């Protein structure tokens, strides 16, 4: 048997910038080295607790649960609706560059720490200290000790009192922030139909059936007998489909064509050969789980996309990427090319990760000479 | 659940292990140090220094007094857990890839690597579970693996058998007393090495993980495959949870293959399967690299995973985890409850 205590912290913090009366309230920070979950494990608190209970420090199995609790930056009444939550004590202070010019020698006098016992049994501790920037930091903590008993294996309890050794020998009680931190909350709910939820592609019966169907079929062009769909044939415009010579192959090829079209479209929808717009292709089919082009970019893309015109026919996507990469991270380069000849059509779209980079690039690259032509760069208009 | 991140290592984790009470977690990595952590809040208790090479393996005796570690500096070392003091060093011709204490802690086995003309061996050392006792230099037993080297090994119940997993995907059973080979059964796909072997709490069956993307539950007595858990990625580790009938698998693309695979993510997730129904019930993400090792808390309250990214993550389960039951399990539970009430009223 041993006793443990849960604490309540209410923290108010005021930074006094040297030679100014401005009180700065730092923005609340979540995670990082100021992770609030450590408040109940901060060295002073822990020591206090051990001395009070003299058995072991903390047996709360989920010590970090409380780190989602909001940061309170004003002194508040200590009555708490949730007596077991632990409010944070972000003791460390973020360095603010705005304070740099005010860095001067300050008096190191600090007011003595105060300890007030409140009527409701909680304790208020006000402490002052200097942070790394020489600023005075006032930390107000409201603490209430709630003792709850928990049965712990005596061997485990004994081990909790062991002194630290090795690289941890200088660490105080409680987790050291340089080795232990708290990750983002993970929602893990076991579910027996987990696989169905995740839409596993290999288990999709439609896709599997289509794959089986196409396994021993070969794609054959009706125009040139090449290994591509007739619609993709480079000689589509210049040659007529092979007549008598290809007639025998025709039947098999067209069947393959149709099957292929169906696999591209709604697989197994039953409407063979009917046109499926690209946006709907893959619905329920093999590509359902895959990414769709443009879907990743969406609206955001239009804001940081440049249209580049008067591009040389010889231009390559990589060249454009290299040119525009100088201004920031380029997420996408699209250079329109003629399908038959492979030459550039003379315009391109460049998407930046950041709009400000796009603005810079637009200003700099408009009128830039590239391969004997003068580029025209403007923001892309929203697609109709 | 909010995982606790332990960043005590600078290189990839190789093994993590809970002690029997589940309050301490030991971790070893390729950066030559051993860390011990309090499992409930992630506080580091200490580190053990002395190894001169990557540490491949670690084990803790059942009373949590002595720690054994095996390293690429060709040694097995014993440590006093409480203080970090080095107690004993055994030298071997090659690296030590796995150590494990027997159920009572009186014996320690070590698996040595096949290299430089030396065959892979399994050595057994007698251990005195006392930090002040003089440990014997002599090896109690040496088993030479002539066909395929052993990658992992462990002691069955009552130290009756030594079970070894091999590089060629087979599992062997040796007599625990004299080291005779009793069985060698191809369990996993040929030439897909077995990467991990962890025991159930009573050591009557164990789980293996293999690069052939499956994990299997096998009995210790006759090496019968009870269950198979298929995954879609090479597995590095597998463990059996207490309290709930689950198994946890860890794996992911090998670090060297990550850049060459097209997968949007490298599948660096811990996978939970139901131990009996063999179906996957969920995944936990978080690591940036493949999971090299997973370990389940013997009290069933948490599990930890160590990754190629150098982090150990301890996860304390939420209520939803403990409440989860299959329909048949729930029915059975209800029936049992009813019976109990009837006996009480009668």
From Swiss-Prot, chain B:
The lineage of its organism: Eukaryota, Fungi, Dikarya, Ascomycota, Pezizomycotina. Its main location: cytoplasm. It is found in: Cytoplasm. Component of the eukaryotic translation initiation factor 3 (eIF-3) complex, which is involved in protein synthesis of a specialized repertoire of mRNAs and, together with other initiation factors, stimulates binding of mRNA and methionyl-tRNAi to the 40S ribosome. The eIF-3 complex specifically targets and initiates translation of a subset of mRNAs involved in cell proliferation. This is Eukaryotic translation initiation factor 3 subunit I. It holds the Pfam family EIF3I. PANTHER family: EUKARYOTIC TRANSLATION INITIATION FACTOR 3 SUBUNIT I. GO terms for biological process: cytoplasmic translational initiation; formation of cytoplasmic translation initiation complex. It comes from the Eukaryota. The keyword Ribosomal protein does not apply. PROSITE patterns: WD_REPEATS_1 (PS00678), WD_REPEATS_2 (PS50082), WD_REPEATS_REGION (PS50294). It comes from Neurospora crassa (strain ATCC 24698 / 74-OR23-1A / CBS 708.71 / DSM 1257 / FGSC 987). Component of the eukaryotic translation initiation factor 3 (eIF-3) complex. One of its GO terms (cellular component) is eukaryotic 43S preinitiation complex. Belongs to the eIF-3 subunit I family.
